[in-house]
Design a protein with these regions (language model features):
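Short, conserved catalytic-motif segment at the N-terminal edge
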Residues: 30-88, 109-111, 193, 250, ...
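Short, P/G- and charge-enriched loop/turn segments at secondary-structure junctions
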Residues: 42-44, 85, 326, 355-361, ...
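Structural recognition of the beta-strand scaffold that forms the well-ordered cores
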Residues: 54-56, 135-137, 246, 371-372, ...
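Short active-site loop at a secondary-structure junction
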Residues: 43-54, 76-136, 199-212, 285-288
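Residue-level preference for non-acidic, small/hydrophobic
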Residues: 41, 55, 61, 93, ...
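Short, surface-exposed loop or secondary-structure junction motifs
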Residues: 128-358
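Bacterial Sec-dependent N-terminal signal peptides
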Residues: 1-29
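Structured C-terminal helix/loop/strand segments within mature extracytoplasmic catalytic/sensor domains
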Residues: 363-416
Length: 416
């Protein structure tokens, strides 16, 4: 009977293992992608690529993942939730500036072959007088990439120039740059003069420049007579479900901090824009300044998804979307669309991922933000981090190729 007992135990044990395997087999198909994403993001957090993240992935009409990971900072105090906001950095260039231009192109016949000096007469007497919308949007204008205006707000001894910027708000110094810095709004004239005088080199060649995007809020106001932010809210953001997209969020507790800035603002940048040039516009700019959650970006980019297209519910025409999101200069190795980023043209080492089609498009942001849409497989993905916390020196997000690995997981899932 001892023998029978042992056999019985072995049989029961084997049966249990079998049943566990059968039931796991079924869930593993559903949870495989979740499991892989969880382990990629959690291991990235433990390697300190970023303290936390949000991931939103949709195929066709099905949301595969809408999840938050980790914490606002490495001290693990505030957990990231789905309704928390990230500083989207250069995603602003497409999710605010470019979609506004797409609408102006439709509603006000904005001609992309026109020189931008048509709308900004101050550029007529400059080296930028012939630069067209097509050139600035495809980053082939030859304009200087970026100007560090904030370096010029300091004296040689490192102190701030009190004629321009102060630590207390007053009637003259009323533009809020950060918690403790207030700028004279008249300084904007200087900023635009500096952009006007900046160099132009090799137009026609690819060089990413953010400078034109500072003109977009002014352009929107000129053409629509509405403030940039109001136009975006009325035209796009207010139509979105669980919308959290906007500039200068009022409730900091839901906002993920970015960098400990020890050069210019001397504080942890939290709730105000990380990009220094955008901060000089009070965070309302065309190059950066938008905050939002991955799920609200997921909702917004539905307007750019050309599959299952129903013209009654869409804010942009299919032809407009195609025009802005296809390669702007097809017979070259330049990879940009108009405003949008696109995959590099070589297939082997294709950036941001080898599986993406030529029709796909998206954008990245300096703070560690990313979205990409591929109409060929009906994929939209949003991946937000604050990799610049506590310092922009942290390049692990790029070195460990985390965005591409995330896309690999999605495409593997599609193949299965």
């Amino acid at each position: 009977s001892f023998m029978f007992c042992q056999l019985n135990k072995i049989f029961t044990f084997t049966f249990v293992i079998l049943m566990v395997n059968i039931s796991c087999g079924q869930t593993s198909l559903n949870n495989n992608i979740d499991f892989k994403i969880d382990s990629l993001i959690n291991s990235s957090i433990s390697q300190k690529a970023f303290p936390g993240a949000q991931v939103y992935i949709k195929i066709g009409e099905e949301i595969l993942t809408n999840k938050s990971f980790g914490y606002h900072t490495y001290d693990s105090i505030v957990k990231v939730e789905n309704n928390h906001f990230y500083d989207l950095a250069s995603l602003t260039k497409v999710l605010a500036s470019t979609i506004a231009l797409m609408k102006l192109y439709e509603d006000f016949d904005l001609d992309l072959n026109d020189p931008i000096s048509k709308y900004f007469p101050e550029l007529k007497k400059s080296n930028k007088k012939n630069t067209t919308f097509n050139e600035v949007l495809s980053h082939t204008s030859g304009w200087t990439p970026y100007i560090n205006h904030h370096y010029l707000l300091k004296r040689k001894n490192g102190k701030l120039k009190r004629s321009i910027i102060r630590n207390k708000k007053s009637k003259r110094f009323n533009l809020k740059v950060s918690k403790n810095l207030f700028l004279r709004e008249s300084y904007h004239k200087k900023i635009f003069k500096r952009i006007k005088k900046s160099e132009v080199n090799n137009p026609g060649e690819y060089l990413y420049s953010g400078l034109f995007f500072f003109y977009i809020p002014r352009l929107v106001e000129k053409i629509t007579s509405q403030k940039y932010e109001d136009y975006l809210n009325a035209t796009f953001y207010k139509n979105i479900k669980n919308n959290s997209l906007g500039f200068n969020p009022s409730d900091y507790s839901n906002v993920v901090p970015t960098e400990q800035d020890n050069f210019f603002r001397n504080t942890l940048v939290h709730g105000s824009v990380h990009d220094e040039a955008a901060s000089l516009f009070g965070g309302r700019s065309g190059n950066a300044g938008l905050f939002g959650s991955a799920q609200s970006i997921g909702e917004l980019i539905k307007i750019l998804e050309t599959w299952d297209f129903n013209n009654s519910n869409t804010l942009l025409k299919k032809s407009t979307i195609t025009k802005f999101t296809e390669y702007a200069i097809p017979d070259s190795n330049i990879r940009r669309g108009l405003g949008f980023d696109k995959p590099t043209k070589e297939i082997e080492e294709r950036y941001p991922n080898k599986n993406l089609s030529d029709q796909s498009f998206g954008h990245t942001g300096f703070t560690g933000t990313f979205f990409w849409t591929d109409p060929k497989v009906k994929l939209s993905m949003v991946f937000l981090t604050n990799r610049v916390y506590p310092s922009r020196e942290n390049q692990k997000l790029y070195k460990k190729n985390i965005r591409s690995k995330l896309l690999d997981i999605v495409f593997e899932n599609l193949k299965n």
